[in-house]
């Protein structure tokens, strides 16, 4: 949901900038006499009522977008514990069983763990 909203914001901003660049470019067109005409520059200025109607007719208004963003950021926050638990489950799936009581120390019997120096080959290999 947030990525879609972010994409919509970026798209709206980029289209607004590109439209602004086109408008600036059209205002800078040179009159064949060699200079800018004041009458021509007035043609590119739109009346405020028309601009207001264009702004209101857009699919996503800036106010609506800001309201949606504020609602998304104010929404109930989930604790990070479920995500941590999911990641733990993922790594446990890769590595082995989960320890049900993480606070109790696990006694490791050193006799059951072979070290690298005590590895013996079976008699059939010799």
Curated annotation (Swiss-Prot):
It holds the Pfam family Neurokinin_B. Residues 1-20 form the signal peptide. It is found in: Secreted. The modification Methionine amide is found at residue 95. InterPro entries: Neurokinin-B/TAC3 (IPR003635), Tachy_Neuro_lke_CS (IPR013055). Tachykinins are active peptides which excite neurons, evoke behavioral responses, are potent vasodilators and secretagogues, and contract (directly or indirectly) many smooth muscles. Is a critical central regulator of gonadal function. This is Tachykinin-3. It comes from Bos taurus (Bovine). The lineage of its organism: Eukaryota, Metazoa, Chordata, Craniata, Vertebrata. The gene is TAC3.
């Amino acid at each position: 949901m947030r990525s879609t909203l972010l994409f919509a914001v970026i798209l709206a901003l980029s289209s607004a900038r590109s439209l602004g660049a086109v408008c600036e470019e059209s205002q800078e067109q040179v009159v064949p006499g060699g200079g800018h005409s004041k009458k021509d520059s007035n043609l590119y200025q739109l009346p405020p009522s028309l601009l207001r109607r264009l702004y209101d007719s857009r699919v996503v208004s800036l106010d609506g977008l800001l309201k949606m963003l504020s609602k998304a950021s104010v929404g109930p926050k989930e604790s990070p514990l479920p995500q941590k638990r999911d990641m733990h489950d993922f790594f446990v799936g890769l590595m082995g069983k989960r320890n049900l009581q993480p606070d109790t120390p696990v006694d490791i019997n050193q006799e059951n763990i072979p070290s690298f120096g005590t590895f013996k080959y079976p008699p059939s290999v010799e």
